[in-house]
Amino acid sequence: MQHDNKVIILDFGSQFTQLIARRIREAGVYSEIHPCNVDPQKIKDLNPGALILSGGPSSVLEDESPQLDPSLLELGVPVLGICYGMQLMTNDLGGRVVSSEDREYGRAEFKGDSSCTIFEGIEDIEKLTVWMSHGDRVEAIPEGFKVCGTTESIPFAAMANEEKKMYALQFHPEVAHTESGTTIINNFVFKVAGLKADWTMSSFVENCIEEMREKIGDNQVVLGLSGGIDSTVVAVLLHKAIGKRLHCIFVDNGLLRMHEREEVIGFLEEHFELNVKCVDSAELFLDKLKGVEDPEKKRKLIGYTFIDVFNEEASALKDVKFLAQGTLYPDVIESESFKGPSAVIKSHHNVGGLPEDMDLDLVEPLRELFKDEVRKVAYELGLPEFIIWRQPFPGPGLAIRVLGEITEERLEILRQADKIVQNEMHASGWYRKVWQGFAVLLPLKTVGVMGDDRTYEHVIALRIVDSIDAMTADWSRIPNDILARMSNRIINEVKGVNRVVLDISSKPPATIEWE
């Protein structure tokens, strides 16, 4: 039977599962993640070209540990087990797993067998640095398997049954700390499974537009446009699919950055002729936030108010049947995946869902994509770099960067300071080098001297961080002369500020945003 050109990853709770999917997609092959307790018939119906078993925090020796349906090892497709996945394969196929006294966490030196297909083309395979994260270990491999690699503390760090195209690794090839990890994954996908690199964003755009046309038919669609890359890409895709039957609603909550509304909406209306209605609700939001200092209350008030405003505007539209959202694949995974200890590190502070009584069907064009793939789609659609590479901006906007009470005066101080930070990062070439860089207005004043006069004015904090996925972050080592220019300009150009400080904390223990 001919199998489809895709890889299915079964998630056993590893924090690295999404990395596996991303590595495979980066190689040009479509991959999907499914929870380990998925109905095996669903996997059979998907007809994958290969199967990967992820790692996980559990022990196969525990009674309540997640298990693999044995029939999935009999599909006749190549299988790769990683960490916990290796131990599951060992257990299910007649080998033996034991609790290890010599646990391995972090880097280890791996000695691999160069004759094993998944290690082909790796020059240093006999002395490879790999990333381990396990307590149990394989003590006896199943019949028909051979040892393909060892470390100083474990004799079975990799195994293979090349006849049945079954492979297993005790280490994590998907993480950046493992040398040649991408080569190992690519060898499995291409040399073992024989899959083709046919997953491209150009083919996605073409297929997505056709699917949206078919699903929506002659109906109308409403979309909440935030100006971020996700909702912008959704808007352009849908506009190409259904034209003027897409109705975009942009809610100006008064908590946006300087000129944000004009820049984003102006571009989209001019170049893509989008049907955008701007709703000026700044006064309403600021009135709701008056006297509120608690960050969680700010978030909830902003979220509820946004829903009320959007609902009112959407309800006024006639014959709208669909609500479009910028849901991404990580959101889908989070809602469906096996809920192990890795499930939630921090709740998102983006504005929440819309009321169920809107009675609209959902359209989610990006639900198959990771964030980096959305950017590639944006390039395919001809969006400019100022939109594609816009740094993340929280749903509550500047409300969680103005610490303490929010007033129009304090918002304006922050807007001016933040604009200077953005200008200097762009001018120095650092904007694209960092994950996020922004200003924060602190809820205190300090004494200063300007000329011969004593001042007692506001403090601005600079928060500039490096990250890959926002789950962890470190402060960016931006050159001092750039920081000095930011500080000097803010103090001299922003009325009411006499001090600038730099936040040099990492996440964890701190978060990227201050509130």
UniProtKB/Swiss-Prot annotation:
HAMAP family reported in the protein's UniProt record: GMP_synthase
Domain GMPS ATP-PPase: 199-390
GO MF terms, alphabetically ordered: ATP binding; GMP synthase activity
Binding site for ATP: S226, G227, G228, I229, D230, S231, T232
Description of how the protein assembles with itself and partners: Homodimer.
The Glutamine amidotransferase type-1 domain, residue ranges: 6-198
Reactions mediated catalytically: XMP + L-glutamine + ATP + H2O = GMP + L-glutamate + AMP + diphosphate + 2 H(+)
Signal sequence, start to end: none
Keywords: ATP-binding, Glutamine amidotransferase, GMP biosynthesis, Ligase, Nucleotide-binding, Purine biosynthesis
EC number(s) per entry: 6.3.5.2
SUPFAM superfamilies listed in its UniProt record: Adenine nucleotide alpha hydrolases-like, Class I glutamine amidotransferase-like, GMP synthetase C-terminal dimerisation domain
Protein's name according to its UniProt entry: GMP synthase [glutamine-hydrolyzing]
Keyword Kinase belongs to the record: no
Residues annotated as catalytic: C83 (nucleophile), H172, E174
Task of the protein: Catalyzes the synthesis of GMP from XMP.
Keyword NADP: no
One GO cellular component, as annotated: cytosol
InterPro entries per UniProt: Class_I_gatase-like, GATASE, GMP_synth_C, GMP_synth_GATase, GMP_synthase, GMPS_ATP_PPase_dom, NAD/GMP_synthase, Rossmann-like_a/b/a_fold
Pathway where this protein functions: Purine metabolism; GMP biosynthesis; GMP from XMP (L-Gln route): step 1/1
